[in-house]
Amino acid sequence: MARRPLVMGNWKLNGSKAFTKELITGLKDELNAVSGCDVAIAPPVMYLAEAEAALVSSDIALGTQNVDLNKQGAFTGDISTEMLKDFGVKYVIIGHSERRQYHHESDEFIAKKFGVLKDAGLVPVLCIGESEAENEAGKTEEVCARQIDAVMNTLGVEAFNGAVIAYEPIWAIGTGKSATPAQAQAVHAFIRGHIAKQSQAVAERVIIQYGGSINDANAAELFTQPDIDGALVGGASLKASAFAVIVKAAAKAKN
């Protein structure tokens, strides 16, 4: 079964009301004639209203960068799945290394978020990946397996049906370093194989994106790899022209 690629922009802590409208207008113009690739953007939650309005009559889906576990009540500062759905959000990034590092989110906590999203009918985009020290120690596969197992051991392999995994080597995020296509493919193949131990069918369907300094210059070569099903894009998603090159490269390589 052919997997439809997904390219998603993670804006991180960037933007303004005007920037949101301007960037989405640019993306709609750039991607107007592109087919064969799903596209999503995850602006800061503050700008979901502007993004939702700007995305009207567009095939670009709306995502966000985090969610909390509680649906409502006395949880100051939290954001619920129901609130996100109110803005038409489809995809939710969880487990990003910046959340793991700066907010001390554990594999177990992230697995709970995964379950909350599945229960709400939203699509989890589960970020996994190793640090530079772990990579140099040959622990890449061990780390990725542990982060996937946190979900599989509590929710079962079927939880990955309709979900997205983003492999983001931490040493490549925002550093300008990127895994080579062969390096990335090897890890993606391992991830798919690890899930296949539980269910071949789920493994064949799950979308596995690459993230980590992916840009308009290296995207096309990465997408030639059979187990790379798209990208979770950071800095390059803040420029319509650069992001569009990545989307077009995915559409061309996978169709």
Curated annotation (Swiss-Prot):
Q: Does the keyword Iron-sulfur apply?
A: no
One GO BP annotation is: glycerol catabolic process
Q: Where is the active site?
A: 96, 168
Instruction: Write down the SUPFAM superfamilies for this protein, in alphabetical order.
Output: Triosephosphate isomerase (TIM)
Name the PROSITE patterns on file.
TIM_1, TIM_2
Q: Which Pfam families match?
A: TIM
State one molecular function term (GO).
triose-phosphate isomerase activity
Q: Which reaction does it catalyse?
A: D-glyceraldehyde 3-phosphate = dihydroxyacetone phosphate
Q: Where does substrate bind?
A: 10-12, 174, 213, 234-235
What Gene3D superfamilies does its record include? Answer: Aldolase class I (3.20.20.70)
Compartments it resides in: Cytoplasm
Q: What is its EC number?
A: 5.3.1.1
Q: Which CDD domains match?
A: TIM
Function field: Involved in the gluconeogenesis. Catalyzes stereospecifically the conversion of dihydroxyacetone phosphate (DHAP) to D-glyceraldehyde-3-phosphate (G3P).
Assembly description: Homodimer.
Q: Which HAMAP family match?
A: TIM_B (MF_00147_B)
Regarding protein family, the annotation reads: Belongs to the triosephosphate isomerase family.
Q: What is this protein called?
A: Triosephosphate isomerase
Tell me the organism.
Histophilus somni (strain 2336)
Taxonomic lineage of this organism? Bacteria, Pseudomonadati, Pseudomonadota, Gammaproteobacteria, Pasteurellales
